[in-house]
């Protein structure tokens, strides 16, 4: 006998649930959470390229350069690159006794 026939049985020409605890608040909350989880999972699978591209490129953006002259933007880029280059040459040697 399948699980479907054990849970749902025809009652007066309609399909109903034999479960008497379906009005229990915990069962209702679990059902709502399950449905929301399913909806979010479907949306994630449908739009994952858009969502993760937004996070990937959106979170890596630097400070806004709107209204800043191009010469100052170039100077800022050079300072950032110099800071990265300077960090590459510093190493810490730790000796354990």
From Swiss-Prot:
Presence of the UniProt keyword Glycoprotein in the record: yes
Keywords, alphabetical: Disulfide bond, Glycoprotein, Host cell membrane, Host membrane, Host-virus interaction, Hydrogen ion transport, Inhibition of host autophagy by virus, Ion channel, Ion transport, Lipoprotein, Membrane, Palmitate, Phosphoprotein, Signal-anchor, Transmembrane, Transmembrane helix, Transport, Viral ion channel, Virion
One GO-annotated biological process of the protein: protein complex oligomerization
One Gene Ontology cellular component annotation held by this UniProt entry: host cell plasma membrane
Protein activity control: The M2 protein from most influenza A strains is inhibited by amantadine and rimantadine, resulting in viral uncoating incapacity. Emergence of amantadine-resistant variants is usually rapid.
Primary location class: virion
Stretches the record annotates as Disordered: 59-88
Biased composition, class Basic and acidic residues, residue ranges: 71-80
Residue ranges of the TM segments: 23-43
Residues the record marks as site: Essential for channel activity, possibly by being protonated during channel activation, and by forming the channel gate and the selective filter: 37
Subcellular location, record wording: Virion membrane; Host apical cell membrane
Lipid-modified residues, S-palmitoyl cysteine kind: 50
UniProt-annotated glycosylation sites, renumbered to this chain: 20
Bilayer disposition of the protein: Single-pass type III membrane protein
Ranges per topology, Intravirion: 44-97
Ranges facing Virion surface side: 1-22
One MF annotation (Gene Ontology) recorded for this entry: proton transmembrane transporter activity
Pfam families in the cross-refs: Flu_M2
Note: When the channel is activated, one or more imidazole moieties of His-37 probably become bi-protonated.
Record-stated family: Belongs to the influenza viruses matrix protein M2 family.
SUBUNIT field: Homotetramer; composed of two disulfide-linked dimers held together by non-covalent interactions. May interact with matrix protein 1.
Domain note: Cytoplasmic tail plays an important role in virion assembly and morphogenesis.
The protein's role, per its UniProt record: Forms a proton-selective ion channel that is necessary for the efficient release of the viral genome during virus entry. After attaching to the cell surface, the virion enters the cell by endocytosis. Acidification of the endosome triggers M2 ion channel activity.
Protein name: Matrix protein 2
């Amino acid at each position: 006998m399948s699980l479907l026939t054990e849970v749902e049985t025809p009652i007066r020409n309609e399909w109903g649930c034999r479960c008497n605890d379906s009005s229990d608040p915990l069962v209702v909350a679990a059902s709502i959470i399950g449905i929301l989880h399913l909806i979010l999972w479907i949306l994630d699978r449908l739009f994952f390229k858009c969502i993760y591209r937004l996070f990937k490129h959106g979170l890596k953006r630097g400070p806004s350069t709107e209204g800043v002259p191009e010469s100052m933007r170039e100077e800022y880029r050079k300072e950032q690159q110099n800071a990265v280059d300077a960090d590459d040459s510093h190493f810490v040697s730790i000796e354990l006794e």
